[in-house]
């Protein structure tokens, strides 16, 4: 893109002078023990990072990026990975940090990592050696912070990672089915960094190193802090209540009074006086030094409509070019959330990914297998961010809507490093992507629009005319990468946004011809307009167009390749009829899904707001605004999931029962247009056996009152009568001896 963005940082990420400890030189791995610190010549760590993941020195792991970034700034950084949280001892293994503790639950939310969408316990953990579950606690951010405070009470604790990022305000917690306070309040940490943390982390570390107390560091973007009142010099907008139209003054009648010149007298011209020219300072932009006061925690917990209102405001204040600060009351204090950080430039992204990662797990794990690492060890991350804005996804809220791309040279250098240094490389790059495969180098063509836009999605309901959809940079990158010596294949495993891809068929041709290993993942998520409108996903027309082009180019290349669509069940806005129509679509197109996903209400997502409140935060919120149907309850969620697997005989009884209740009994049978087969004789006998009335057998001697009783009542009455008879037998006098 030729135009220069108006969203620029105050200073470059790598422009800070290095901390004095840079004299110790580089570290092969960031130390996890005192022995490693001794080998590096360190007597202490300046910063200690605590994480719920195993330490893998790879740029796909957040703690590796943060640790290497801080080490490049000259700080001595240690890592405590998956500590024993039963006491404070494991949190003291590296000694007392000179500056602060950085705490994260890991690459995933600890609750999502631990529980399924049906709140069932998982028995594995892909971020743990040997896939062992139970190595991190529930709500790991809270637990780790508590132990850090117990270990060293006077050391600041800074929260980060996706778990803290998505819980920075009062939020609905699916696992406890209630609204919880901001994690910053519950944890009693000193600061929270949300989103990608390079900029705020580096700035805060240097300011702490220069002696500034953390209580006075309150102006850093991408951070949240606890305050007693609004920061000085900021003006506020009160949005604690729903907007209501005020009193409208009557419009004066233009001919109600005589005008000054109505007497037709000539008006003497006024003599213009010379005035000195004064240079006016530029007017401040309306979002500068402005905060929005959200409804308090107590209000959003007690009023679902106000919760939806607060959620809507938060999602509209995410553009770093025009976002205002947010403030939310929790008891007698406030959570103050600064505007998002300025996205990294291409040069800064290149520098971050050029840090000396070893691209392997820490040697302390030996030969243990870490599934998350196995998945990404031959993949390359080419960009960050996503402007899709899907309601159920947290990527936009975490990484931002502006795409941050690496340069072509930087990506090629990383591919060559994988080829030359990573053990077990066979010549196949497993993925060249990011949150979305085909958003590389795509940005808004209008700098002014990019700076001021508050749209939740750049592609829904239609692709914005300002959005650049030219895939030529991506195509050139693919071609250069696959021409490298020693590279046999470049696969694309990240999801493809097909509604953007159809705008540039050249990309689809390149993809189908060279970069698909038989199957390509895409995510229509649903086929019906009701749920799609709540998901902010395109209709099936874009999917059909993409499939047509993909099949055509695959055939031209002489390859037999298939699309694997992903769907979500039980999403807000999805009725039983919608799921039946989706199941019929799947059967018509001969799809039999093995893995299906029920909607998982994660914190901060718009879909989670719909799930909890029954309101639509994508439109203006009011007590009489649009209600959203929400499939809740285990039975209905099981049904929606079962309909995605209509071909599984175990789901047929549940589907038949639902079809009969909906008046769609014609979909049960052996005809081609039927969804499930009719029950067999054995199934009908088994159903009758299970539904058989278990009332006891009656005779003509059974009292009429007992006959009218239900089985439970009859059993209770029989038990009472038996007790009375036994009591009477005990009170009866004994017969005289010899009578």
Curated annotation (Swiss-Prot):
UniProt KW Metal-binding keyword: yes
Radical SAM core domain residues: 372-650
Any one Gene Ontology molecular-function term assigned to this protein's record: 4 iron, 4 sulfur cluster binding
Domain of life: Bacteria
Cofactor annotation remark: Binds 1 [4Fe-4S] cluster. The cluster is coordinated with 3 cysteines and an exchangeable S-adenosyl-L-methionine.
Keywords: 4Fe-4S, Iron, Iron-sulfur, Metal-binding, S-adenosyl-L-methionine
Cofactor: [4Fe-4S] cluster
Signal peptide: none
Region of interest (Disordered), ranges: 685-739
Bias (Polar residues) ranges: 704-725
Binding locations of [4Fe-4S] cluster: 386, 390, 393
InterPro entries, A to Z: Elp3/MiaA/NifB-like_rSAM, Methylthiotransferase_CS, rSAM, rSAM_horseshoe, UPF0313, UPF0313_C, UPF0313_N
PANTHER family in the record: UPF0313 PROTEIN YGIQ (PTHR32331:SF0)
Family in the record: Belongs to the UPF0313 family.
Descriptive protein name: UPF0313 protein YgiQ
